[in-house]
Design a protein with these regions (language model features):
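Flavin-dependent oxidoreductase catalytic cores
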Residues: 1-401
Length: 401
């Protein structure tokens, strides 16, 4: 029976275990360039035993970033910074991944550490480097976010090529794995959801029209991304609101993504509307007869059943319904819990976020807790810290020269 510390092979890449570092925006980049923070932040998690170490969402255009301080991969000049970090991740025995994204209407924010009060991220001013956000329709995410403009057909048609060019840069930077961000209300997800996509042309309305941009993006990336390297998509499998994107739709989209060359679905949820904990009211704007008319949807907000492993059922449904590899993510914090998710066939791997922020060495501790220390590579430089805890396999990590 496959467990958390069994290797996982996807195309030509074999991961040393089934623990991944989920992408987490750090708000530390300047003009999209990664720096020493990313080297230390991600390098520590590679040394801590994770098999897949994923960079934060990198904007495929400057306007595709969530915040003004997020990473990017829209310019060749940004490649070298990633190369340096990837060399260290590889030396530590992990595989490097990058999440490529376009934030769409949920962009041009101040970095999360600069947000004021309890209402979430604030829109960056032009003086702070902000821009006018754009999405499928002119519908703001919330009352404290700016109203985006609706994208033109020409702008939408350009998106797959923007992702493909970023994928080529990811290859030049030495990445082993690409994940496309099609979740959390960002651009690709906003086309999927009827809540945020009110278009009446070939990009909206029917299911086939709403998934069109996702599929075209997947095909464009697969055409330039090496055949031996995995391609994943992060999906929000439900919006958690009536009339939104559904699990059944996610299963069908996952089938079609698999046919387009996608290897794994990173199954998350939500993000199209504010969560119930956000006190702001959700507003939508519908273009009707050429006039922009406001429509208040009352307290339209996601009712998310937060709890340990709350998104695992969605991952399991996609795995069985679409016959594709899946990663489970969301409030996975306990080694026994994570191991059971894999052993019970509910997911093929787990992605940890905040738990790995709290403890970069969580994989090592999990291996010890599960009696799998012999299968965990621990840096020999840390021998004294782990030898008396049951660690038995130590590998050197060569410093950069």
């Amino acid at each position: 029976m496959t467990g958390l510390f069994d290797p996982l092979t996807v195309r030509g890449l074999t991961l040393r275990n089934r623990i991944g570092v989920a992408p987490m925006c750090q708000g530390t980049s300047t003009d999209g360039h990664v720096n020493d923070w990313h080297l230390v932040h991600l390098g520590a998690r590679a040394l801590g035993g994770a098999a897949l170490v994923m960079f934060e969402a990198a904007g495929v255009t400057p306007e595709g970033r969530i915040s003004t301080r997020d990473a990017g991969l829209w310019d060749d000049a940004q490649i070298e910074g990633y190369v340096r970090v990837n060399r260290f991740i590889s030396a530590a025995g992990a595989a490097s991944a990058i999440q490529l994204g376009h934030a769409g209407r949920k962009s041009s924010f101040r970095p999360i550490w600069a947000a004021q009060g309890m209402q979430g991220l604030r829109v960056a001013t032009s003086a702070e480097g902000g821009w006018t956000a754009a999405g499928p329709s002119a519908i703001p995410f919330d009352t404290d976010t700016a109203q985006p403009r609706a994208m033109s057909d020409e702008e939408i048609c350009a998106v797959p090529a923007q992702f493909a060019r970023a994928a080529q840069r990811a290859e030049a930077a030495g990445f082993d794995w690409i994940e496309v961000h099609a979740a959390h209300g960002y651009l690709l997800h906003s086309f999927l959801s009827p809540i945020s996509n009110l278009r009446t042309d070939g990009w909206g309305g029917s299911f086939d029209n709403r998934i069109r941009l996702c599929l075209e993006t997947a095909r464009a990336i697969r055409a330039v991304w090496p055949e031996r390297k995995p391609l994943a998509f992060r999906l929000s499998y439900t919006d958690w609101v009536e009339g939104g994107w559904t699990l059944d739709e996610s299963v069908e989209l996952s089938r079609r993504l698999r046919e387009a060359g996608v290897d794994l679905i990173d199954a998350s949820s939500g993000g199209t509307t504010p969560a119930a904990t956000n006190l702001a009211r959700h507003m939508t704007t519908r273009a009707l007869d050429g006039q922009a008319r406001g429509r208040e949807d009352g307290a339209l907000r996601a009712q998310i059943p937060l709890g340990p492993g709350y998104q695992v059922p969605g991952a399991e449904a996609i795995r069985s319904g679409a016959d594709i590899l899946v990663a489970a993510v969301g409030l996975i914090t306990d080694p026994t819990q994570a191991d059971a998710i894999v052993r019970e066939g509910r997911a093929d791997m787990v992605m940890l976020a905040r738990e790995l922020l709290r403890d970069p060495n969580w994989p090592i501790r999990a291996a010890l807790a599960l009696g799998q220390a012999a299968r965990m590579s621990i840096p020999c430089q840390y021998y004294l810290a782990w030898s008396d805890r049951g660690g038995s396999r130590f590998d050197p990590v060569a410093p950069e020269t």
